[in-house]
């Protein structure tokens, strides 16, 4: 709730056990799809091997941590009031890559279309049968940079590699400025 302003968008995969993604308002269908794809990737749908899921979004003003009178909300739950907008049949794909900022190696996770702007090298992943630790070791062995623990933390669940890519990332300072402007 601390990051969710009234006019921001609140994205949630339409499946129990999904993470919330908060983003500034946008009418751009491609941006909405990418945000929905990120929300879908970190949902339970990935962990159980589903390859598409619906994702809804609402304005921050429609979200409350308080239930209606006489009802109870479990810890971590929220109420959504009013009309939900849906992005249907979102493909579960996530790019996991790295970028070097000086001597520091950062692991980044992003929708596949955003990865070239954020990572030097990345893999587009889909739900699969390689456990997180095994997939992370395979990725780190190919990159020969960054740590296994950092890659494990970025993976949403059991995965397999769909494709490999290379990017030309913006400087970290530029990325930080974009997020500060939100």
Where are these regions (language model features)?
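Extended, highly charged segments
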Residues: 1-182
């Amino acid at each position: 709730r601390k990051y969710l302003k009234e006019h921001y968008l609140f994205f949630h995969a339409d499946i129990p056990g999904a993470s919330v993604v908060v983003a500034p308002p946008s009418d751009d269908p491609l941006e909405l799809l990418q945000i929905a794809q990120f929300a879908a990737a970190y949902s339970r749908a990935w962990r159980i091997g589903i390859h598409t899921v619906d994702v809804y979004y609402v304005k921050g003003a429609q979200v409350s941590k308080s239930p209606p009178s006489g009802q109870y909300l479990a810890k971590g739950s929220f109420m959504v009031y009013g009309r939900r907008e849906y992005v249907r049949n979102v493909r579960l794909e996530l790019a996991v890559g790295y970028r070097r900022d000086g001597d520091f190696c950062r692991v980044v996770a992003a929708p596949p279309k955003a990865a070239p702007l954020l990572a030097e090298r990345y893999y587009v992943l889909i739900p699969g049968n390689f456990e997180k630790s095994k997939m992370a070791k395979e990725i780190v062995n190919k990159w020969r940079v960054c740590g296994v623990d950092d890659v494990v933390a970025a993976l949403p669940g059991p995965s397999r590699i769909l494709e490999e890519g290379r990017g030309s990332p913006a400087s970290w300072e530029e990325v930080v400025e974009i997020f500060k402007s939100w």
